[in-house]
Each structure stands twice: as structure tokens, then as C-alpha cells.
């Protein structure tokens, strides 16, 4: 698979991940803790797709590395909020199946 196909495939996968997160939190949570942590998870998780898309439009190698660095930080934050939500029993792990975002 060439680089362009991989980029398009990863764009589609990160977008699907963002859509799943939006659907998971489409119904307003009943308690404040879930609402706050869920909002953080929603924000960082959906920005993954946007930041990856932006990295595909990089104008130079340095620009690409910079954009991927932001993406890496957002991915780590998304994982953090996912762990917090799951370990606090605020969401079920099934909502966010990590297999959907594996490289």
C-alpha cells in the first residue's frame, strides 16, 4: 500500500473514531462528572481526525512533524480521558473499542 492510500485510510479511520465518540456522548450525561470528563474526551478525540487531516496538508517536513506532534498530544489526552471514564465506571469500554484505531 502506498503512502497516499495509507494517508487516506488513516483519515477515514480517524474520522470514524470521531463520529463514534460523538455518538457515544450524543445523549446528555446525567451527572456532572460524566459531563465534564466526557466533554474533554469528546474534544480531544474529535480533534484527532481534524489534526491528522491538517497534517496531510503540511507544506514541509518540519510543518508535518509539528502537526503530528500536536496529533500525538491529542491522542495521549484522548487515551487519558478514556481511561479516566472507564476506570471511574462512567462509560463502558465497548463504547470505545481500541481495535478501531490501531495502526
Annotate each PLM feature.
Residues 1-103:
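Amphipathic alpha-helical assembly/interaction segments
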Amino acid at each position: 500500500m502506498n503512502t497516499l492510500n495509507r494517508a487516506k485510510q488513516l483519515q477515514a479511520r480517524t474520522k470514524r473514531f470521531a463520529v463514534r465518540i460523538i455518538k457515544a456522548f450524543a445523549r446528555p450525561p446525567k451527572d456532572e462528572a460524566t459531563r465534564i470528563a466526557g466533554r474533554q474526551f469528546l474534544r480531544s478525540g474529535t480533534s484527532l481526525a481534524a489534526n491528522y487531516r491538517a497534517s496531510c496538508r503540511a507544506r514541509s517536513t518540519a510543518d508535518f512533524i509539528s502537526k503530528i506532534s500536536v496529533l500525538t498530544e491529542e491522542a495521549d489526552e484522548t487515551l487519558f480521558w478514556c481511561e479516566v471514564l472507564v476506570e471511574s465506571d462512567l462509560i463502558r469500554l465497548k463504547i470505545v473499542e481500541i481495535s478501531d484505531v490501531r495502526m
